[in-house]
Amino acid sequence: MMKWVLFIPELYYLLMAVVFFACSLSRRLQSGVLYRWAVILAGGGLLATVLAVNQNGFIFFDCYRVDLYSQLFKILLALGTFWVIFSCSELQGIDSRYHAEFFLLTTVCTLGMMMLVSANELLTVYVSIELSSYSLYLLVPMRKQTEIYVETGIKYFMIGVTASAFMLFGISFIFGVAHTTYVPDLVKTLPSLIKEPAAIIGLVLTLCGFFFKQALFPFHSWAPDVYMGAANQVTTYIATASKMAAAAMVIRFVNLSGGESPLFTQVLVGLAVLSMTFGNLVAIIQKDLKRLLAYSSIAHAGYMMIGILTMSEHGVASAIYYSAAYLVMNFACFMVIMKVADDGRNLQIKELAGLHKRSPLLAMTLMLGLFGLAGIPPTVGFTGKFLVFAAALRKGYLILVIIGMINATISLYYYLIVIKAAYLLEPERPYPDVRVDTWTRALSYGLIVLMIYLGVFPDQFVALTEAAARSLP
């Protein structure tokens, strides 16, 4: 008998998707009613995922592995999805005809990413990543004035399909070398074969698909255009929840090499350095806040890679911690964008002028989120960078850590430009007051507390990430 209890979170999101599909068939359902049901269902999904955290086992002929590592990332996915849906009380940037489809595709994408982090076999990985990717391809062009932004959707689709083709090609190389597609078998056989060119090529090509999702240089070209072209709500989802699944799979697949190939490690070091440097330098000249955060995400993919490439328990744990920290910090910034640009427009940095007067709470949330991304204590971002750099130092990557610290210093410049606009600049013209309802206030206070608490008292969560790292095969 199959252990269906191991599949409870995924079954819940599958049923949730069916509900939204039924809602999409009826055009009489008001957006307010749809939103309330979406929040309730997303909250239920988060609860179901948290309750399933201690489940362990294999299902679907061992193609699906449930352990603490996968369950922790599922909680991050469910949390990110809940936050995004909770903050979507007004879907101003999305065509009113597609509000039900927005919730449907968001749910299906979350389902695909949950399947991805538990996938224990390469073809299951491929099917899962395609399920999540095609949902995102459809979400991006849903913005109002689609004729203007349809180019963004097409570009995202074409680059994504190319990345998927590379990944499938890499899987064929791995199968040809190792004669298996099961991850536990690859863990045993691939380290001894990793010095063979075919094995290295296969692993690198497979990782290309995940690097694309993570926006790691040079697989980043879609990110700035998609962040700008998609509706604010869709961009928030792409920048937060979808990055969790990519991080989970990069960690899992990098560890397949077992650290036996110096060439493979050097490639990862190069990608980390290029991502940090390119992302931070190009972010300096940005005027659009979403585009700035897009280049920031490229840099943060590089920071995360520092922990991953150590291929140690501490390195993996630090990368997991950094992923969770990034989810909280990035969502805080994008929530402010959604609330300030409540008509669905893209937000220029100069439009934040005087935000501390129009909405002191949102200004504080944005400031702490940016301080965290910059790695300033006592925020969760500082602790995340400290753990990542410490793990790299333990493995002797001193030069890499120095480069990372230099890049973190560079990032201070453009993050402080945004904070300066919110707190020190006077608006060039009168901007409307920012409407902050009770639920937004509660969410803002919660994010502020979380960003500081996890930064000052990280011990419990660090212990959880270390336990998750130990559960990896």
Swiss-Prot record:
Localization: Cell inner membrane
Signal peptide limits: none
Keyword 4Fe-4S attached: no
Enzyme Commission numbers on file: 7.1.1.-
Gene Ontology MF term list: NADH dehydrogenase (ubiquinone) activity; NADH:ubiquinone reductase (non-electrogenic) activity; quinone binding
Catalysed reactions, as listed in the record: a quinone + NADH + 5 H(+)(in) = a quinol + NAD(+) + 4 H(+)(out)
Tagged with keyword Amino-acid biosynthesis: no
Membrane-spanning intervals of the chain: 5-25, 33-53, 66-86, 102-122, 157-177, 199-219, 226-248, 265-285, 292-312, 318-338, 362-382, 399-419, 445-465
Cited HAMAP family: NDH1_NuoN_1
Protein name, per record: NADH-quinone oxidoreductase subunit N 1
